[in-house]
UniProtKB/Swiss-Prot annotation:
Function: Forms part of the ribosomal stalk which helps the ribosome interact with GTP-bound translation factors.
UniProt subunit comment: Part of the ribosomal stalk of the 50S ribosomal subunit. Interacts with L10 and the large rRNA to form the base of the stalk. L10 forms an elongated spine to which L12 dimers bind in a sequential fashion forming a multimeric L10(L12)X complex.
SUPFAM superfamilies membership: Ribosomal L11/L12e N-terminal domain, Ribosomal protein L11, C-terminal domain
Species this chain originates from: Leuconostoc mesenteroides subsp. mesenteroides (strain ATCC 8293 / DSM 20343 / BCRC 11652 / CCM 1803 / JCM 6124 / NCDO 523 / NBRC 100496 / NCIMB 8023 / NCTC 12954 / NRRL B-1118 / 37Y)
InterPro entries linked: Ribosomal_uL11, Ribosomal_uL11_bac-typ, Ribosomal_uL11_C, Ribosomal_uL11_C_sf, Ribosomal_uL11_CS, Ribosomal_uL11_N, Ribosomal_uL11_N_sf
Lineage, opening ranks: Bacteria, Bacillati, Bacillota, Bacilli, Lactobacillales
Protein name: Large ribosomal subunit protein uL11
Annotated Gene Ontology cellular component terms: cytosolic large ribosomal subunit
Keyword list, A-Z: Methylation, Ribonucleoprotein, Ribosomal protein, RNA-binding, rRNA-binding
């Protein structure tokens, strides 16, 4: 008989830096997860992605065992690595610029986690994240133009 999922915990943790300290420890403790076992497994699985924030979805079963799925780093985190920072006032102050090729690379990386049917739609989602961070795409101010992606971007 299959195990019954009793709880799902979603967290964003720095890769290879999960510790029993807050905020990770209390969230896992409330769910009844063996904190030491989770941190050891998470740190081992994400060791190659050091420096990134990794979203993780932990399914807790009725026998207090668990399994977890790591996702790709958030688009905002990937854009921040390229640009260096986000803007506190995205409509007036621009934080930096990215190219369409960089947007495409992020979209291809995140494609499995995005609700998009093709790469163009995924690129538009990443472009929206860039807009909210005050980042221009190929010099195009997305708050004015709306999009820098042409229909033939594929």
């Amino acid at each position: 008989m299959a195990k019954k999922v009793v709880n799902v915990v979603k967290l964003q943790i720095a890769a290879a830096k999960a510790t029993p300290a807050p905020p990770v420890g209390p969230a896992l403790g409330q769910a009844g997860i063996n904190i030491a076992q989770f941190t050891k497994e998470f740190n081992a699985r994400t060791a190659d992605q050091a420096g990134s924030i990794i979203p993780v979805e932990i399914s807790v079963f009725d026998d207090r065992s668990f399994e977890f799925v790591t996702k790709t780093p958030p688009a905002a985190d990937q854009l921040r690595k390229i640009v260096g920072k986000g803007s506190g006032e995205p409509n007036t102050k621009k934080a930096g610029n990215v190219t369409l090729d960089q947007i495409r690379a992020i979209a291809e990386n995140k494609m499995s986690d995005l609700n998009a049917n093709d790469i163009t739609n995924a690129m538009r989602m990443i472009e929206g994240t860039a807009r909210s961070m005050g980042v221009t795409v190929d010099g195009v101010d997305l708050t004015v133009e709306g999009t820098a992606i042409k229909e033939d971007a594929e």
